[in-house]
A protein has these predicted regions:
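TM-adjacent membrane-interface loops and short helices in multi-pass inner/ER membrane proteins
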Residues: 264-292, 305-311
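Transmembrane alpha-helical segments and their membrane-water interfaces
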Residues: 77-120, 215, 316
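Transmembrane signal-anchor hairpin modules in multi-pass inner-membrane enzymes, especially those
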Residues: 1-76, 176-177
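A membrane-periplasm/extracellular boundary helix in multi-pass inner-membrane enzymes
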Residues: 218-254
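Alpha-helical transmembrane segments of multi-pass inner-membrane proteins
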Residues: 113-131, 156-198, 204-212
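Membrane-interface micro-motifs in multi-pass membrane enzymes
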Residues: 34-49, 132, 145-166, 200, ...
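Membrane-interfacial helix-loop-helix modules of multi-pass inner-membrane proteins that assemble, modify
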Residues: 121-157, 254-255
Length: 323
């Protein structure tokens, strides 16, 4: 008994908690990298382990009274959004932020890079050689000609390109100080190759937009870097305007909608049938008339979580990043 008491008194529980958090983080990255959804049984199985690691981190971390107050606010907001919208994204985000104390962000990014690169390579190579389902299908191009696309063992071709996009983005972030023309050439070639296989027009456009922001940040003087901070609210306003004022009879709007694979029509249809709300709404409201998946994060939050929650994030980001 004395040995047990001595063990608990002398053990570095803070380090144990940090290690547990890295385990929690790695499991979540792994499940997303393998394209598992929260409804999949294997995801639920590993989620139990992840939550156990998260609990260890919380009970072994010392928080100040102010931090505890913020934890209560974030958990209440996350749980409320989870219960009402039936989406756990915000709850997991807040839980991760809460448990990050004393953890090295650089190491977390490094883990995410290694896991993402390994899983993407495994899925692409495995599906190419027949180990996994390559997910062959056809889709109309800009001239409405059917072309072959592949999902590489993931749900959809767009999901496959998203996995590539996130992996490239992590690589760029992790090696940000080393970025040069060779990095641009290499990552662009990779993105264009998978664009050919997935025909994800929105994804490739966003990829080169990210590079445009990187180049701007590298060469712009400090007084012009306000543009980077404003990119988030500008993107939100643009998404909102296209959703509110979409008109299929307008040739410009019709072309823009076609270039983003019908996403504007999907958002506009939900807006016209369900309207907007200041507070979160139950997800079942959107099942009566299903128009498609809302994968524009700005409008997903706006329609599902309400205007108050949607405004909170771009305003907070802009306030924190303005020079």
């Amino acid at each position: 008994m004395d040995r047990i008491k001595t063990f608990f008194r002398t053990s570095d529980w803070e380090s144990v908690g940090v290690a547990a958090f890295y385990g929690y983080f790695a499991i979540n990255i792994l499940m997303k990298a393998l394209a598992y959804d929260h409804g999949d049984n294997i995801y639920k199985f590993f989620f139990i382990f992840a939550m156990s690691f998260w609990a260890i981190k919380i009970v072994t971390t010392r928080y100040t009274l102010r931090e505890i107050a913020w934890i209560a606010v974030l958990l209440a907001l996350g749980l409320g959004l989870s219960v009402i919208t039936k989406q756990n994204t915000w709850l997991l985000l807040f839980m991760t932020i809460i448990a990050m104390k004393n953890c090295r962000f650089e190491f977390m990014i490094q883990m995410a890079v290694y896991i993402r690169v390994f899983c993407l390579a495994m899925l692409v190579i495995g599906s190419t050689f027949g180990v996994f389902d390559i997910g062959y299908k056809t889709t109309p191009d800009s001239s409405y000609v059917e072309i072959p696309v592949y999902s590489f063992a993931m749900n959809e071709p767009n999901t496959a390109f998203l996995a590539v996009f996130l992996t490239l983005l992590l690589l760029l972030y992790y090696n940000y100080k080393k970025l040069n023309v060779w990095w641009f050439a290499g990552t662009s070639a990779t993105a264009l190759l998978f664009y050919k296989f997935t025909y994800c027009r929105t994804g490739i456009a966003v990829f080169f937009f990210v590079w445009a922001l990187i180049i701007f940040e590298k060469i712009a003087k400090n007084r012009w870097k306000v543009v980077l901070a404003l990119s988030v609210p500008v993107g939100a306003v643009f998404s909102l305007c296209t959703m509110l004022f979409y008109d299929g009879g307008n040739s410009v709007m019709r072309l823009l909608n076609h270039l983003v694979s019908g996403r504007i029509y999907i958002m506009s249809s939900y807006y016209k049938t369900q309207g907007v709300s200041l507070i979160p709404r139950a997800q079942e409201l959107f099942y009566g008339q299903y128009y498609g998946l809302i994968d524009n994060t700005y409008m997903f939050v706006f329609l599902y979580c309400g205007a108050i929650v949607a405004l909170f994030f771009p305003v907070s980001y802009t306030h924190l990043t303005l020079p």
